[in-house]
Amino acid sequence: MCGIVGIASKKNNLNDILNGLKSLEYRGYDSCGVAGVSDEKIFFEKSISKIYELEKKINKRKIQSNLSIGHTRWATHGKPSIKNAHPITKEKCTIVHNGIIENFEELKIKYKIDKKLIITDTDTEIISLIIERLLKKYDDPSIIIKKIAKHIKGTY
């Protein structure tokens, strides 16, 4: 079962994100990750080990973020691996997902997603690629989410 922790604050919140993920460890997971904004750029770090290992990677980089999201993943699409761990991060979009997108193959066709852009074996990545495309057309993320949500079938 996946776990998601997200925090927007005025101070660095990565320790709070990691502590939140640690509190979800009892649910079980096969990989974990954190993403956020640091120096106006998206960063991410992932692990297929314990959250403690993820924490060591983050501390080594000395990253600070006041807008962060963390995820523990129990794989439903794609085997447990660094590339399949969430958050799925693209140029302007970071996404985590708990559930199954049943029609992700159809969405690839509908939105004409180039197979060369697909890096993971997850159903979640298609959503990040669609968001990236729609960000070129719309400035308001809420419009993008509404447009995509109309077409997603599954549980999320």
Model-derived regions: residue spans:
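Conserved short alpha-helical segments that host acidic/polar catalytic motifs at enzyme active sites
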Residues: 1-156
